[in-house]
From Swiss-Prot:
Avian ovomucoid consists of three homologous, tandem Kazal family inhibitory domains. CDD domains: KAZAL_FS. This is Ovomucoid. It comes from the Eukaryota. One of its GO terms (cellular component) is extracellular region. It comes from Gyps coprotheres. It is found in: Secreted. The record marks L16, E17 as: Reactive bond 3.
Length: 54
């Protein structure tokens, strides 16, 4: 199981760095910050499916 530590999030601004992550919602997030902000918004229901594009 792939795990990302989102304890430092949410953050108001994300970098434009591209390191894609695939969420459990089958959406590709451009980087950890975008993904972790979405995890916080989902109240923890969103999880990481795998690293890379969906």
């Amino acid at each position: 199981i792939a795990i990302v530590d989102c304890s430092d999030y949410p953050k108001p601004v994300c970098s434009l760095e591209y390191m894609p992550l695939c969420g459990s919602d089958s959406k590709t997030y451009s980087n950890k910050c975008d993904f972790c902000n979405a995890v916080v918004d989902s109240n923890g229901t969103l999880t990481l499916s795998h690293f890379g594009k969906c």
